């Protein structure tokens, strides 16, 4: 198996839909019931690069494994449920600390899933026009008002950049990195992953260039062979 060129990791509390998001994108289906034990991953070829996407368990007993899966990650998808504010708070309280093992220039996406269960948006049409934005659809009486607003995710994103001591001017804008999705309908799922792929690829190329510059030509550094001079009798 070819070694991945980059890594993306999904983090978040249990039941926010991390596995469903990944399976919706990779397998084009919505699983009825699924629970990740420990971790699982897919390989996605994007352009000429191989990117691994890691799904992690949100259960407390598997919490410590998160930092292991985040090691060397180029991007982290922090996932919450738009209908449960506590799942957004948990990202900062429980999961942000697990990202210490990620790359120093790691990207962060804040993703509010299960937007199909709210009364504020029509998500039946699949992909829409952009992250953290969308046209207001007709209200459905069986749905509930959204409990977490896009501006809450934007605030968390900016807080993460400060926590990581990353220059906000050098990182993608919050509006580009905060998404609302529905794994059930596919709303914004392709947009989420492919936005990250397009951002991660230049990072991979830059890392390869830096590694190439640091490569030393051992042959050119060999000490010239000395010849022993002899004495004439």
From Swiss-Prot:
Keyword Protein transport: yes
UniProt keyword list: Cytoplasmic vesicle, Golgi apparatus, GTP-binding, Hydrolase, Lipoprotein, Magnesium, Membrane, Metal-binding, Nucleotide-binding, Prenylation, Protein transport, Transport
Biased composition (Basic and acidic residues): 119-130
Stretch list, region Disordered: 119-138
Main location per the UniProt record: cytoplasm
Tissue: Present in a variety of tissues, but not in brain.
Compartments (UniProt record): Cytoplasmic vesicle, Phagosome; Cytoplasmic vesicle, Phagosome membrane; Golgi apparatus
GO molecular function: GTP binding; GTPase activity
Positions contributing to GTP binding: 17-19, 32, 36, 58, 113-114, 116, 183-184
Motif (Switch 1): 28-41
GO CC term (a single one): Golgi apparatus
GO biological process: cellular response to type II interferon; phagosome acidification; phagosome-lysosome fusion; protein transport
Cofactor annotation: Mg(2+)
Activity regulation (record text): Regulated by guanine nucleotide exchange factors (GEFs) which promote the exchange of bound GDP for free GTP. Regulated by GTPase activating proteins (GAPs) which increase the GTP hydrolysis activity. Inhibited by GDP dissociation inhibitors (GDIs).
Catalytic activity: GTP + H2O = GDP + phosphate + H(+)
UniProt-listed Enzyme Commission number(s): 3.6.5.2
Lipidated residue numbers (S-geranylgeranyl cysteine): 231-232
Enzyme class, broadest EC rank: hydrolase
Membrane topology: Lipid-anchor
The family this protein is said to belong to: Belongs to the small GTPase superfamily. Rab family.
UniProt remark on domains: Switch 1, switch 2 and the interswitch regions are characteristic of Rab GTPases and mediate the interactions with Rab downstream effectors. The switch regions undergo conformational changes upon nucleotide binding which drive interaction with specific sets of effector proteins, with most effectors only binding to GTP-bound Rab.
Its biological purpose: Plays a role in apical endocytosis/recycling. Plays a role in the maturation and acidification of phagosomes that engulf pathogens, such as S.aureus and Mycobacterium. Plays a role in the fusion of phagosomes with lysosomes.
Protein name from the UniProt record: Ras-related protein Rab-20
Gene this chain is encoded by: Rab20
